[in-house]
């Protein structure tokens, strides 16, 4: 009986094809080749340790099955040295980072932010938990009520198995690792995993009363997952509202997650899939992939991670531009009773929009704190830079970052600086208390059970405006031919060319009705 390379333990179809292409086309040849000869063939995914494993497993198969062996693989099957000016494929490829080298790369800063949006209780926080191991509902009220109230944050490392041609997160690999299996190896085939990148998740609340919080989170996202529960009719009110929010924020890299497929039959899942396709027709998510998932049981999470790599690319880093940082959280990390000499300065969390910053540099925070009737910018120095439990020397665009400062922690506690803009002194835009907006209204009110037409803005009407991560009250002061003059309270400092999401009170709730572009 003859055996194929795929019969050797640990060798899959892809690796077998690579071996055949290199001249190692039988189990006998593999069992006789020397380790250095096999590794010198430069076959993707086969280093010295992997070569030794494959050769030993081939020898075991030969001995157990009594396969007749042939003379050792001839030396001429190894590729000859290229001519002096000849370019080879291997010189172009960047050597993948594997094994123990992953330990340091996992500590690197995340490269992009992926948002999770959708209707309340459709499984956004559960999906983050399945991918990262973190439960982002950390606050007591969130845990008591079972819903996300604040923006949740978590980080993940994306890894790749060349043998299985599959993607997974570091947490997924660790939780699936079998007893005795080495770290940083594929739980399915034991192949050493390759590092791809670190990413951050922004878990946005889905409840209707927290729409403004969701809008502020959208400003941090480079791409998004729109979660739709398979056990409910699609679309639900906040599913509509969140998709429009992504449109306003200009987020086009979207993945649709059809969650909770474990709770429905095959027929119900297919019916729900049809509803999703009909819902997104003609929207920015029209061509988005729809991935059926069970976040609770971990079904198809590998397809989700693959979609991250294929659809939501890391943004280009604009390191040479003036540093700007958008604050999404601020807090006091000191425990009650901490001695004065042991107190830490206030911490601000958010994302770098452009440029870079290092420990020890001076920064300015605008609008800052209120002094009588005006706002006074804050100036301080950066004492530390962190992402999760990892400390960094420099912060750059991509991922969610914590900046430790020399500020009195009383100024940062309780998210008091959310929405403020950070930069080097005297480089930030002016603080404004009035803005002229070119307004684009939606045809119909989103997020409400009852569909109704959006009416034009009225003089002295009160609005809720969200720009970046800042939420501010607006009052329509003047109605011009093609724009509106709106007063802002509190004043804001926003990046140039910002988009203002506009909501008005409808049936005692703020509903998204459109967006405005700043003029002048």
Please name every model-derived segment:
Residues 96-97, 105-106, 110, 278-417, ...:
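Conserved catalytic-core segments of large NTP-driven translation/proteostasis enzymes
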Residues 1-79:
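Compact, charge-rich alpha-helical regulatory domains located at protein termini
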Residues 82-101, 107-133, 197-200, 220, ...:
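Helix-rich terminal scaffold detector
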Residues 196-200, 204-210, 219-241, 249-270:
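Conserved Switch II/interswitch segment of TRAFAC-class P-loop GTPases
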Residues 113-116, 264-266, 409-520:
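C-terminal effector modules of nucleic-acid-centric enzymes and ribosome-associated factors
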Residues 85-209, 221:
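P-loop NTPase switch module centered on the Walker A-proximal segment
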């Amino acid at each position: 009986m003859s055996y194929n390379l795929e019969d050797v333990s640990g060798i899959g179809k892809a690796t077998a094809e690579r071996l055949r292409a290199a001249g190692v086309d039988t189990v006998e040849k593999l069992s006789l080749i020397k380790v250095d000869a096999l590794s010198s063939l430069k076959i993707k995914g086969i280093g010295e340790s992997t070569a030794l494993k494959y050769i030993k497993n081939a020898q075991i198969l030969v001995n157990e099955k009594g396969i007749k062996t042939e003379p050792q693989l001839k030396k001429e099957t190894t590729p000859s040295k290229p001519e002096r000016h000849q370019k080879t494929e291997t010189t172009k490829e960047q050597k993948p980072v594997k094994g123990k080298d992953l330990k340091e790369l996992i500590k690197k800063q995340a490269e992009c932010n992926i948002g999770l949006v959708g209707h309340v209780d459709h499984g956004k926080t559960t999906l983050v938990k399945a991918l990262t191991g973190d439960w982002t509902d950390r606050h007591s009220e969130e845990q008591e009520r079972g819903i996300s109230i604040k923006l949740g944050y978590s980080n993940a490392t994306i890894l790749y198995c060349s043998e299985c041609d599959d993607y997974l997160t570091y947490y997924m690999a660790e939780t699936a690792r079998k007893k005795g299996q080495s770290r940083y190896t594929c739980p399915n085939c034991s192949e050493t995993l390759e590092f791809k990148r670190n990413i951050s998740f922004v878990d946005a609340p889905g409840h209707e009363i927290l729409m403004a919080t969701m809008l502020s989170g959208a400003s941090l996202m480079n791409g998004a997952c729109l979660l739709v529960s398979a056990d409910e009719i699609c679309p639900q009110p906040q599913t509509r509202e969140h998709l429009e929010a992504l449109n306003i924020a200009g987020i086009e890299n979207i993945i649709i997650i059809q969650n909770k497929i474990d709770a429905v039959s095959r027929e119900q899942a297919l019916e729900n899939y049809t509803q999703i396709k009909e819902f997104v027709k003609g929207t920015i998510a029209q061509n988005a992939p729809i991935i059926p998932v069970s976040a609770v049981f971990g079904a198809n999470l590998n397809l989700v991670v693959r979609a991250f790599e294929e659809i939501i690319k890391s943004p280009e880093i604009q390191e040479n531009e003036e540093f700007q940082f958008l604050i999404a959280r601020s807090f006091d990390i000191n425990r009650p009773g901490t001695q004065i000499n042991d107190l830490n300065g206030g911490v601000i969390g958010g994302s770098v929009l452009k440029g870079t910053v290092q420990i020890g540099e001076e920064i300015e925070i605008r609008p800052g704190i209120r002094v009588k009737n005006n706002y006074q910018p804050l100036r301080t120095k950066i004492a530390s830079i962190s992402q999760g439990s990892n400390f960094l020397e420099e912060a750059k665009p991509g991922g969610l970052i914590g900046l430790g400062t020399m500020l009195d922690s009383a100024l940062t506690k309780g998210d008091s600086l959310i929405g403020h803009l950070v930069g080097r002194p005297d480089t930030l835009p002016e603080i404004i208390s009035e803005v002229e907006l070119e307004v684009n209204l939606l045809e119909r009110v989103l997020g409400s059970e009852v569909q109704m037409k959006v009416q034009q803005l009225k003089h002295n009407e009160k609005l809720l405006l969200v720009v970046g991560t800042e939420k501010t009250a607006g009052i329509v002061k003047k109605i011009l031919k093609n724009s509106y003059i709106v007063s802002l309270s509190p004043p804001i400092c926003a990046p140039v060319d910002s988009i203002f999401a506009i909501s008005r009170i409808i049936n005692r709730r703020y509903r998204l009705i459109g967006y405005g572009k700043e003029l002048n």
